[in-house]
Amino acid sequence: MRRKVLAGNWKMYKTRGEARAFLEAFVPLISPGAENREVILCGPFTCLDLLSAQAGPYAVGAQNVHWADHGAYTGEIAPQMLVELGVHYVIVGHSERREYFNETDSTVNRRLNNAQDHDLVPILCVGETESVRKDGITEAHIRSQLDRDLELVDMRRLIIAYEPIWAIGTGKTCEANEANRVCAMIRKHVNFEGVPILYGGSVKPENIDELMAQSDIDGVLVGGASLEAKSFARIVNFEV
């Protein structure tokens, strides 16, 4: 059985003090029944050591990693630096990185491979824009992303997140059955039954139970709703 993964992406939010306060409120809210679920907190670089140092029912993830181990890459971070901070997971290819920082499928692939070379588990993000969706080519677009992003990547040490870009931070939510259909298509295309496939896009307490009841959705990648302890705890404690 594939494990359930609940990942919070804090993006560029939370100072160290705010992260500490979040943990104090969040950890006691996790129900004992959630122990078979993998909870991941992907904080900003400045909070990663703090998240690792605190005892809690969660793993630590980063939001970016470079394709090189060292070099003149101002502002970037190498995988071994993340490992030293107690990081186990890293988001790669998020739509915001692709849009604002010009990441391409080629650089995403290089980041994925280097992360795995250092025993990090990447969370690969793929998804379509509103225009791609309206043109009816969502599946073709995502298959193309997967083919280019996953070259030489070890599927046994990978998580894939489907994030319809039109639903990120917009309040629009992809219908659960449609999200499940796309996740099933992704699983079939990568031809590896064991890879966890998450849904990301305006996930909130109000829709988590319906999303997690879907057969091909193994978890969620949560943005805004992961910033508040009570909200994210309800997501982690989903009921199906």
From Swiss-Prot:
Reaction(s) the record says it catalyses: D-glyceraldehyde 3-phosphate = dihydroxyacetone phosphate
Q: Could you say which EC number(s) this protein's record lists?
A: 5.3.1.1
CDD domains tied to this protein: TIM
- Asked if the keyword Membrane belongs to this entry, the reply reads no
Q: Which residues form the active site?
A: H94 (electrophile), E163 (proton acceptor)
Q: Which UniProt keywords apply?
A: Cytoplasm, Gluconeogenesis, Glycolysis, Isomerase
Q: What does this protein do?
A: Involved in the gluconeogenesis. Catalyzes stereospecifically the conversion of dihydroxyacetone phosphate (DHAP) to D-glyceraldehyde-3-phosphate (G3P).
Report the protein name in the record.
Triosephosphate isomerase
Lineage here is:
Bacteria, Bacillati, Cyanobacteriota, Cyanophyceae, Gloeobacterales
